[in-house]
């Protein structure tokens, strides 16, 4: 990506992004909401971080009795403002942080659980490794998209124009390579779960736990 340009995600309007993700032919927003309910409940963590939080989809499943702090991280300031507006009921628990994960991973606070859904595709393995290590997370739960046609990784929709620049930052993420990248930094895979989507794509959830001998 040209260093003089801002990140494409800073230009995508949240309403267009969410409208695209909610289409009957896409249904990723709905699928992600149900996945995040499971992610928040899966492990004995009282602090969590959602990387690429966007408009806060899935945060309705955060239970105040379980979590002391949940950090929502995104590069788009407007997304974070909307998230804070939507989840006033999580006041005192939810913290929204504008951080460029590729260049500013050192700004991330600690968290026991890191959730990264459809995020690694836009920062790559190396930046994700740095982010995870910075948080010192015990558990990492990720979702990546499996594409039947890798040349069409954004589903057709009336909002397709909004995503024109994403090719600049998109990486095709593979399960084996992600598992290897996590092993490099001391994490072992503990869960694999696939959720089919209506457009021939699928969401693959991969969870990892920090190796005791590396912490």
Report the location of each language-model feature.
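Conserved beta-strand signature within the Rossmann-like core of class I S-adenosyl-L-methionine
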Residues: 136-151
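Conserved acidic residues
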Residues: 46, 112, 138
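Class I SAM-dependent methyltransferase SAM/SAH-binding core
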Residues: 47-104
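Class I SAM-dependent methyltransferase Rossmann-like catalytic core
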Residues: 1-43
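Core SAM-dependent methyltransferase catalytic element
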Residues: 191-215
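Short alpha-helix
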Residues: 166-186
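Short, glycine-/aromatic-enriched active-site segment of Class I SAM-dependent methyltransferases
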Residues: 147-169
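A short SAM/SAH-binding and catalytic strip from SAM-dependent methyltransferases
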Residues: 112-126
């Amino acid at each position: 990506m040209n260093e003089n340009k801002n990140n494409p995600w800073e230009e995508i309007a949240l309403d267009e992004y969410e409208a695209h993700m909610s289409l009957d032919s896409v249904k990723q927003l709905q699928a992600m909401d149900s996945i995040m309910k499971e992610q928040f409940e899966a492990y004995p963590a009282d602090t969590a971080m959602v990387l690429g939080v966007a408009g806060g989809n899935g945060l309705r499943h955060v239970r105040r009795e379980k979590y002391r702090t949940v950090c929502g991280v995104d590069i788009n300031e407007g997304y974070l403002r909307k998230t804070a507006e939507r989840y006033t009921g999580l006041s005192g628990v939810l913290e929204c942080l504008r951080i460029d994960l590729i260049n500013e991973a050192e700004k991330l606070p600690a968290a026991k659980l890191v959730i990264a859904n459809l995020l690694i595709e836009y920062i790559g393995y190396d930046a994700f490794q740095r982010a995870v290590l910075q948080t010192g997370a015990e558990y990492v739960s990720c979702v990546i998209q499996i594409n039947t046609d890798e040349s069409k990784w954004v589903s057709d929709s009336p909002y397709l124009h909004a995503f024109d620049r994403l090719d600049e930052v998109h990486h095709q993420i593979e399960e084996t390579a992600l598992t290897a990248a996590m092993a490099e930094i001391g994490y072992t895979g503990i869960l694999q779960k696939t959720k089919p989507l209506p457009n021939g794509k699928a969401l693959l959830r991969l969870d990892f736990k920090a190796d005791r001998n590396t912490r």
